[in-house]
């Protein structure tokens, strides 16, 4: 999320933030700068949030002046999921999706995801009426086609599935992911030295409406959430290796 997505007021996803020019560049743009300079970053996704009152998806300052002008980014910019819609509601800086599309592409957005509601047939009407320059369209198209050409997608548009198998679901990668996840836990409070759990404990009660709901526990940006999975369980509980029987009370009885 370029940029400032992690400092929204109250920690609210898609919220707003007020940040100084120096902090934006030295803290929030810094990881992107490293990726551009050291790794040749080819694509960037805009942040959902607004920065100092301006939604990033429609901000020429963020997507063109800073990202391209100051940071030297040469790739293409894609919208976060439905972020262009937010120019209409809730940010209310565009009256309709036609206006939102014009604002976004002029700001430096090249691709709208997940569907074309702003980048639609309406753009043709905007060009004919003089509200939008064809040069802006050509610029966005050129950026995308350049990446496709450099990746060889015109000659070979389909992935080599056999080659992919060498890199997917590797045991070493799974072990590293598990290690990273385990080390990321932060214990803020441990009353009566409850943790680590004693092996003498025979039963644990997990109480609340999210007790057995993977979607709620993992958040919306995870594979289980995408599939809208929930844990299968018996009415009287579920067996685990340790510490023993776990009893779910979803209704908080």
Predicted regions: what they are:
Residues 1-253:
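Glycoside hydrolase catalytic-domain context in secreted enzymes
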């Amino acid at each position: 999320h370029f940029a400032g997505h992690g400092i929204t007021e109250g920690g609210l996803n898609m919220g707003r933030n007020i940040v100084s020019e120096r902090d934006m560049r030295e803290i929030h743009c810094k990881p992107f700068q490293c990726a551009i300079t050291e790794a040749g970053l080819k694509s960037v996704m805009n942040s959902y949030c607004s920065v100092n009152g301006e939604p990033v998806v429609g901000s020429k300052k963020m997507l063109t002046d800073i990202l391209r002008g100051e940071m030297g980014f040469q790739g293409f910019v894609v919208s976060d999921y439905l972020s262009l819609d937010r120019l209409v509601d809730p940010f209310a800086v565009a009256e309709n999706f036609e206006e939102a599309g014009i604002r976004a592409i002029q700001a430096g957005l090249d691709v709208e995801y997940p569907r074309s509601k702003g980048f639609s047939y309406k753009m043709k009407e905007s060009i004919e009426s003089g509200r939008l320059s064809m040069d802006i369209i050509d610029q966005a198209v050129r950026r995308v086609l350049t990446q496709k050409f450099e990746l060889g997608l015109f000659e070979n548009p389909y992935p080599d599935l056999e080659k992919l198998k060498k890199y997917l679901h590797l045991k070493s990668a799974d072990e590293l992911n598990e290690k990273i996840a385990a080390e990321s836990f932060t214990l803020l409070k441990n009353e009566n030295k409850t943790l680590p759990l004693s092996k003498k404990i025979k039963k644990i009660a997990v109480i609340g409406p999210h007790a057995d709901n993977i979607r709620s526990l993992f958040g919306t940006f995870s594979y289980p959430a995408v599939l809208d999975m929930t844990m299968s369980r018996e009415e009287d509980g579920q067996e685990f290796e340790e510490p023993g029987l776990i009893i779910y009370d979803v209704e908080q009885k």
